[in-house]
Design a protein with these regions (language model features):
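Short amphipathic alpha-helix with an adjacent loop that forms part of the alpha/beta core around
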Residues: 145-153
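An alpha-beta-alpha
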Residues: 75-140, 159
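Aromatic/hydrophobic pocket-lining residues that form π-stacking "cages" and hydrophobic walls in ligand
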Residues: 47, 120, 172
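Flexible, small-residue-rich helix->loop connector segments that border functional cores
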Residues: 1-2, 93
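Non-catalytic positions within long, well-ordered alpha-helices that form the structural scaffold/packing
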Residues: 21, 28, 94-95, 153
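Short, high-confidence coil segments that cap the C-terminus of an alpha-helix
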Residues: 31-33, 99, 156-158
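Structural motif
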Residues: 36, 159-163
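Beta-alpha junction/loop-to-helix N-cap segments that form part of ligand/metal-binding clefts
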Residues: 2-70, 78, 137-139, 143-145, ...
Length: 172
């Protein structure tokens, strides 16, 4: 790039805080000078805390928690934040009159999911939307969400808001 030799090396953080720090340290030992990643919030927060000590430039393309860039002056994020997603989702539902009774299924053990849900809840209330039920799951019990779906149906939800990753959403 511009006459400079660039070498890329990849490590998989498996969306796990401890594994992401191990991957970061492995890349640092290899000689990394710039980190492009991690891509999700939980690993990024863990790596960002480590990178401050090293003053390593970190650029995450898609970690969306607002706290990501609060870690240090060396950490940058490209995409929109969780609060923006929650607000925009509630605004869209209200402005397009998609529903007034909303069920929510979210991952209470995940900063991304919880962050979007928290802001969605606040904005939904200001828009006159009623959250009839909010059903949580955790990373330990995310393989079957049929109970959460049934509770949304029982509560009379006209729409179910899913601030979750596609793997979990694909089960619904």
């Amino acid at each position: 790039i511009n006459g400079m030799q660039v070498e890329f090396k990849f490590e998989d953080d498996e969306h796990d805080a401890e594994k992401s720090v191990n991957a970061y340290n492995s890349l640092k030992d290899w000689g990394m000078q710039v980190l492009a990643g991690p891509v999700t919030t939980t690993p990024t927060l863990a790596v960002a805390a480590e990178s401050v000590n090293d003053n390593m430039f970190v650029l995450t393309p898609s970690a969306s928690a607002q706290t990501v860039i609060e870690t240090g002056d060396n950490v940058f994020q490209i995409c929109f934040t969780d609060p923006n997603q929650g607000v925009a989702s509630a605004d869209y539902i209200a402005e397009n009159a998609l529903a007034t009774k909303i069920g929510v299924i979210y991952d209470s053990s995940d900063a991304y999911s919880s962050g979007i849900y928290a802001k969605f809840k606040t904005e939904a209330e200001t828009k006159g939307l009623e959250i009839v039920t909010a059903e949580a799951f955790t990373s330990d019990n995310k393989s079957d969400l049929s109970t959460q779906v049934a509770k949304c149906q029982e509560a009379g939800a006209e729409l179910v808001f899913l601030p979750i990753y596609y793997t979990e959403a694909s089960q619904i």
